[in-house]
Amino acid sequence: YTGKDALKDSNEARDFHRYAAQQFAQAGADFLYAALIPTLPEAIGMAYALAETGIPYIISFTIQADGCLIDHTPIADAIAAIDDLVSPAPVCYMTNCVHPGIVMQALLQPCNQAEIIHRRFLGIQANTSALSYAELDHAADLHSSDPETLADDIMKLRSIVPLRIFGGCCGTDARHMKAIAERITE
C-alpha cells in the first residue's frame, strides 16, 4: 500500500504487467481488473498493458483521505491522465481495500470536485475498518464494523458518486455483502 515498491516509470510498468495481461486474454477472460494501484506511473503502465489485450478492463486505485493516490496524485487527475493517454480507456475506475468513509473524504477534497469523478469513478471494494493503511499495518487486532454500519457508509458514499460496482475487501464476509445488497435494492 505504501507505493514504495511501485514501478516508477509507466513504460516499465507496462512491460512488467503485459505478460500477465496477455495470459489472461489468451485464457479467455471476459474482463480484466487491476487492483491496489498506488501510483500514477504504475496505473498508466497497467492501463497500457490491459488496453493492448482488447478486453474491457477496470483500474482500482489505492487512495487516501487527502484525495490522492499514494504518490500524491489527485484521483481526478489520475483518471484524466489515463483517459487522455490510453486507448481504449478503462471501463471505469474504482478503489479497493479502503473504508467508504475514507473514500468519501477523498472524493470531497477540492482537488476531486470534477465532473470526471462523477462520470468515471464507479466502484468500491470496501474494508470494514475506518483506519488508514498505516494504522491497519501496525494494528495488533482486527478492526471491523458491523454489516449494517458498513452498508450505511456505502450508501452515504453512493449519495455523492453514482457507484455501480460494490464488493468487499478486508474484514468483510457474507453478512456485509448481504447488508450492502439489501441497501442497494431498497
State each model region's role.
Residues 1-186:
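Domain-level signal for soluble alpha/beta catalytic cores
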